[in-house]
């Protein structure tokens, strides 16, 4: 429908329309809104080179030599943004969804029009040479739910012409899928490490790390649209191609997000617990291939429950709290399954005017009645490896975890740190305390910047300004991380492990990336001091 409207509107402009002198073949248009779904829109910047649409991005686009930069000043774009083709779209000075008169009187409200590369109208003002010098751009609305989808949403979400997207009178949706291919190699391992975990050469080789698929969309039966999320994963590949488990499939994320107000919503279903930025963020959006040993050991991946979340202080603060009981997957009754109460609060003590520089602080806590005991263990941040530290199952009258987090992001630079402490009230082993922390740094060499999600208090995926399919180099990111975990206390010798990790990520496009991780691992356990070095290569492909 949007394409049809744009075609009809553009057809109404003839070559005699007066236009400001602009070369439509080489132009940058900044500060323009496009529809992302019926309930939201995003602000983007557009680059047209040699009469073809080369780039549409939420990130800054510098003005190349010989180009003209125009400021759309928050205008609303209707048309078809198809990369590699001559542009055909119109920019209106208002949102036609809020005021239909904008469409009825395009002679007044159209500020820019181009049809198959031919300029039909332009009354936009020239913009400054860089986005930083331009007027303040409108801020895009964030994802409605507290926990974003497991995969990045495309910017063209809501385009029912795409085969994997749909739209009816009361629903919208998009089908997403991802496959992750890994190759593991262990260059070295000392004899103490072999005594602790065995010969790591048996864990070398390739594997399909995961195959995930699902759908996310909106339900428009209510004043504020509800968001549904359904995702599953096959486990057959990670289980060594066992014939009797080839069809194993786990629904790991199914929930409804119901907004009460513009700043508060309720999520019900199987979902991530609201604690730790690293845990809430999608795995495919982190700078390293796997989460830290600290997060994997102490915090569950997902649980069944309800989360109430919202923002305060003009979105400088986010909060979330929930109750969880995983009786559906445990096979036990609610009374015989552990019940947990979880909460998280984040705060931005500093945000620059253009939001390119910010400081994030967060605190989270988790309390469980310990009905199913406690058990903390983890691999050395490689999926294809044995557990290096392990407390073994512990009886428990209750257990708790608390989390401290801090992040500083300035443009392409990101520095993050988290601490997690875990306490167990064990009738046989006494009061036990375990802990761990990590410090992670990321530098996007090509200059892109991760968006900050004010609703959830997390950072988003790495944007790709110019993919290899557009003649660019894609996006390159360097990452480094140090993590430490201590699972030894009292009579429990779960071990202590420190890991230094280095990584390089190459995002060829928003849906295709390859990366390489190196880790140096030291492990003190069972009276031995083991060390090992591991390397993992990964290919990630997502369905567009």
Regions found by a protein language model. Give the residues of each.
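Positively charged n-region of N-terminal signal peptides that target proteins for export
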Residues: 1-4
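Bacterial N-terminal signal peptides
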Residues: 6-16
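Histidine-rich, glycine-flanked metal-binding segment
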Residues: 21-25, 38-78
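C-terminal helical cap
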Residues: 30-35, 83-97, 483-487
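N-terminal periplasmic/intermembrane-space "pro-region" immediately following the signal or transit peptide
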Residues: 47-50, 69, 109, 125-182, ...
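C-terminal cap of metal-dependent C-N hydrolases
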Residues: 86-125
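Outer-membrane beta-barrel pore domains
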Residues: 144-152, 187, 199-200, 357, ...
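Outer membrane beta-barrel
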Residues: 162-187, 200-370, 434-470, 477-479, ...
């Amino acid at each position: 429908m949007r394409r049809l409207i744009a075609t009809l509107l553009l057809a109404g402009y003839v070559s005699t329309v007066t236009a400001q002198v602009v070369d439509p073949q080489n132009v940058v248009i900044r500060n323009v809104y496009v529809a992302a779904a019926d309930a939201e829109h995003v602000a983007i910047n557009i680059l047209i080179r040699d009469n073809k649409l080369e780039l549409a991005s939420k990130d800054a686009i510098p003005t190349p030599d010989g180009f003209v930069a125009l400021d759309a000043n928050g205008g609303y774009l209707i048309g078809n943004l198809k990369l590699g083709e001559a542009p055909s779209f119109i920019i209106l000075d208002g949102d036609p969804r809020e005021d239909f008169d904008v469409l009825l009187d395009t002679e007044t409200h159209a500020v820019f029009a181009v049809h198959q590369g031919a300029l039909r109208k332009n009354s936009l003002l020239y913009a400054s040479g860089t986005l930083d010098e331009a007027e303040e751009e409108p801020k895009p609305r964030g994802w409605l739910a507290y926990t974003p989808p497991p995969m990045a949403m495309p910017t063209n979400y809501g385009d029912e012409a795409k085969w994997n997207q749909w739209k009816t009178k009361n629903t919208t949706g998009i089908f997403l899928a991802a496959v992750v291919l890994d190759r593991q190699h262990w260059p070295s391992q000392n004899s103490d490490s072999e005594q602790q975990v065995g010969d790591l050469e048996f864990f070398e080789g390739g594997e399909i790390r995961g195959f995930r698929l699902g759908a996310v969309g909106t339900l428009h039966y209510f004043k504020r649209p509800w968001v549904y999320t359904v995702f599953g994963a096959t486990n057959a590949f990670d289980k060594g191609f066992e014939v009797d488990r080839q069809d194993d499939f786990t629904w790991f994320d199914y929930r409804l997000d119901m907004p009460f107000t513009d700043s508060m919503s309720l999520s019900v279903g199987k979902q991530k617990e609201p604690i730790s930025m690293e845990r809430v963020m999608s795995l495919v959006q982190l700078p390293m291939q796997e989460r830290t040993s600290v997060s994997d050991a102490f915090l569950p991946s997902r649980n069944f429950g309800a989360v109430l979340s919202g923002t305060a202080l003009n979105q400088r603060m986010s909060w979330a709290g929930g109750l969880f009981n995983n009786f559906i997957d445990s096979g036990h009754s609610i009374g015989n399954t552990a019940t947990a109460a979880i909460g998280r609060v984040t705060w931005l003590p500093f945000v620059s005017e253009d939001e390119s520089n910010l400081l994030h602080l967060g605190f989270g806590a988790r309390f469980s009645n310990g009905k199913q005991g406690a058990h903390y263990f983890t691999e050395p941040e490689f999926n294809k490896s044995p557990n290096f530290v392990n407390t073994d199952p512990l009886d428990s009258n209750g257990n708790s975890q608390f989390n401290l987090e801090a992040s500083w992001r300035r443009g392409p630079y990101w520095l993050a740190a988290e601490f997690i402490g875990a306490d167990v009230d064990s009738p046989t082993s006494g009061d036990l305390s375990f802990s761990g922390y990590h410090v992670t740094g990321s530098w996007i060499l090509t200059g892109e910047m991760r968006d900050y999600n004010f609703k959830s208090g997390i950072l988003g995926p790495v944007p790709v300004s110019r993919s290899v399919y557009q003649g660019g180099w894609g996006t390159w990111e360097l990452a480094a991380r140090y993590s430490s975990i201590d699972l030894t206390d009292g009579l429990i010798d779960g071990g202590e492990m420190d890991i230094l990790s280095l990584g390089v990520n190459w995002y060829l496009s928003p849906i295709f990336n390859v990366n390489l991780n190196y880790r140096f691992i030291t492990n003190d356990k069972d009276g031995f001091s083991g060390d090992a070095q591991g390397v993992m290569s990964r290919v990630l492909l997502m369905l567009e």
